[in-house]
């Protein structure tokens, strides 16, 4: 089952994750019978990390930590500007004291195509932005900050 609570995410983006703590905990609690609950949200992930639920997995941090291990040239790709601060904060937390200065690529023009349901154009636009950025500068790792962005790997 894939579930997105857009109102919860919108409130967390506008008022901060702490403002939705109780509602997020309730939402996750309704899923406690599942074998695993996977959070793929950089905005809500740090909040979810604090919940004492053994089968709640927040994978953004793990993915970002893995990317940092590949080398100092990291590109963070986002397409929704409202996720920029949370994604960059998580990346900086994962970088720690390593000598890494990440680059953020914002594919803002792609997001309206996703909202319109045109995922093919959405994915192609992201893939093109990544190709252009990596043609100008090599990167050791490219982080796609949203799960909806994974298909460009096939483009």
What annotation goes with each model-predicted range?
Residues 1-155:
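Non-catalytic structural scaffold of enzyme domains
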